[in-house]
Amino acid sequence: MKQTVYIASPESQQIHVWNLNHEGALTLTQVVDVPGQVQPMVVSPDKRYLYVGVRPEFRVLAYRIAPDDGALTFAAESALPGSPTHISTDHQGQFVFVGSYNAGNVSVTRLEDGLPVGVVDVVEGLDGCHSANISPDNRTLWVPALKQDRICLFTVSDDGHLVAQDPAEVTTVEGAGPRHMVFHPNEQYAYCVNELNSSVDVWELKDPHGNIECVQTLDMMPENFSDTRWAADIHITPDGRHLYACDRTASLITVFSVSEDGSVLSKEGFQPTETQPRGFNVDHSGKYLIAAGQKSHHISVYEIVGEQGLLHEKGRYAVGQGPMWVVVNAH
């Protein structure tokens, strides 16, 4: 398995393309100059395209991915109704979902043969919309509205329209600020990192049409931490055994172990990392974690080791200015 790591650096308007080898070492293979401040990125389900959101002219760009080395070639673009904060796709590669924090909306862009062709739906009134996350069964779009302490739930119709479910939302504790999410491989649990109180909620997905319950909330910070909380990103290993979340104020990655059924998280430790880690990701083998420092302009690669899933630094690399997003593609 070959793996390519993409790093988005909005301040220098670049995507750095790296080869990740089996020992966790990175080799720079390409630097792409992007026409705008590039932030969120996602690889298409068929691994043919990388979709990226750019500002200040709000657009989604599609780059064709070379199957041999992961190199990028611009392919298409489509306008967006707000500044892109987060980007994702459905599992069949029919739609791109874009959450916009500043515009307070989530939009759906239709794809034709992998290329974006236009927005088909926009839902407004989602204050602080920070991500759009399709459930493993491709039926429910989870959309955290950070400023409203709620996660809105939509069914995605065949033509890409978003239909509010019943119930239409789940709520967090006041002041939590739900931000990014991941799902357990067994498709029974979701995990949401809350930006404003730096906690992680575990949501049990009992029924795709309702009966969703928060079964655990864990503080992700050390006991003596008294500074402003500012959590950012969350990821889980492919085998579902280890979960990670980061806080930008503390420049820290919190390590969690996950119970066999996915219902219980246990805090295992903390890893100091790059300054202001806005984004990170786990590779497809589940052996390595790559974290980007928005203020350090570097990335660090960590090996995931032991039953606890603790992190051991393998290498550190300079990238563009203000790196914010990390995507890993296996090909």
Curated annotation (Swiss-Prot):
Catalytic activity entry: 6-phospho-D-glucono-1,5-lactone + H2O = 6-phospho-D-gluconate + H(+)
Gene Ontology BP annotations: glucose metabolic process; pentose-phosphate shunt; pentose-phosphate shunt, oxidative branch
Pathway note: Carbohydrate degradation; pentose phosphate pathway; D-ribulose 5-phosphate from D-glucose 6-phosphate (oxidative stage): step 2/3
UniProt entry tagged with the keyword GTP-binding: no
Pfam families for the chain: Lactonase
Positions of post-translational N6-acetyllysine modification: 287
The entry's keywords: Acetylation, Carbohydrate metabolism, Glucose metabolism, Hydrolase
Top EC class, one word: hydrolase
A GO-annotated cellular component: cytosol
InterPro entries (alphabetical): 6-phosphogluconolactonase_YbhE, Cycloisomerase_2, Lactonase_7-beta_prop, N2O_reductase_N, WD40/YVTN_repeat-like_dom_sf
EC number(s) given by UniProt: 3.1.1.31
Coiled coil: none
GO molecular function terms noted in the UniProt entry: 6-phosphogluconolactonase activity
PANTHER family: 6-PHOSPHOGLUCONOLACTONASE, 6-PHOSPHOGLUCONOLACTONASE-RELATED
Family to which this protein belongs: Belongs to the cycloisomerase 2 family.
HAMAP family documented for this protein: 6P_gluconolactonase (MF_01605)
Function (record text): Catalyzes the hydrolysis of 6-phosphogluconolactone to 6-phosphogluconate.
Protein name: 6-phosphogluconolactonase
High-level lineage: Bacteria, Pseudomonadati, Pseudomonadota, Gammaproteobacteria, Enterobacterales
